[in-house]
């Protein structure tokens, strides 16, 4: 009876996993094969020649080297993750632990911001960055990503802080600890899984972004990895080996991040779903 209970969900999960894995395997196989073999069908295993030439050509592309794009993506993604997580954690702790007159209205406004489409804000943001001389700069894009991530990280961390027991904090107050000392030395270590989970999600979102980078970065030398990918397709024909190799390298960074911190996924799911 117990086996039957889990059989159907497991079959569904495995079916979905295989459906996602087959296209990825196709991309991976195309990235390590010569162009002549790819155009005959990536699923044909004879002949099957393994080469790293596609990766080398993608990294050292004469016009849009993906290596420079990966570096630019890291320059944008790392501060765009650290800054909003720090600021949002402070605000989230205030929402979770303190009472002030407009607390509920302000939090409702933050939740409303999460539903705001990027397309509605891109025009005023464009003129704002242009007037501040931040258009076409990494700093401008970092500010936009950081501001855009604040709302959901506040919501995420507020729920996570609300789950934490308050006994240790109350004991620290009795011992004379200040609010900041309690937050820095007690709450943050307890909330480390939630902080890392929020950081992973924010980093992955910034790394995968194409729309904001396309609007605010116009200098080809500053293009991030997601901007360079479609430019590698060629003008007269598509070099599938080059394009798939670049795609694998761009995908590899968030995949590695998820693989290293996968044990925090459960905490992240709880942080989103539980509200106190």
From Swiss-Prot:
PROSITE patterns, from UniProt? ABC_TM1
Pfam families given for it? BPD_transp_1
**Keywords of this protein's UniProt record, alphabetized?**
Cell membrane, Membrane, Transmembrane, Transmembrane helix, Transport
Output the SUPFAM superfamilies linked to this UniProt entry.
MetI-like (SSF161098)
Q: Subcellular location, in the record's words?
A: Cell membrane
Cited CDD domains: TM_PBP2
Q: Which residues form the ABC transmembrane type-1 domain?
A: 70-261
Q: What is its main location?
A: membrane
Q: How does it sit in the membrane?
A: Multi-pass membrane protein
Top-rank taxon of the source lineage equals: Archaea
GO cellular component terms listed in the entry, alphabetical order: plasma membrane
Q: Name one process (GO BP) from the record.
A: transmembrane transport
Using the record for this protein, list the coiled-coil segments as residue ranges, or answer none: none
Which chain regions cross the lipid bilayer? 12-32, 75-95, 109-129, 137-157, 186-206, 241-261
Q: Which family does it belong to?
A: Belongs to the binding-protein-dependent transport system permease family. MalFG subfamily.
What is the stated purpose of this protein?
Probably part of a binding-protein-dependent transport system PH1036/38/39. Probably responsible for the translocation of the substrate across the membrane.
From the Swiss-Prot or TrEMBL record, give the protein name. Answer: Probable ABC transporter permease protein PH1036
**What organism does the record attribute this protein to?**
Pyrococcus horikoshii (strain ATCC 700860 / DSM 12428 / JCM 9974 / NBRC 100139 / OT-3)
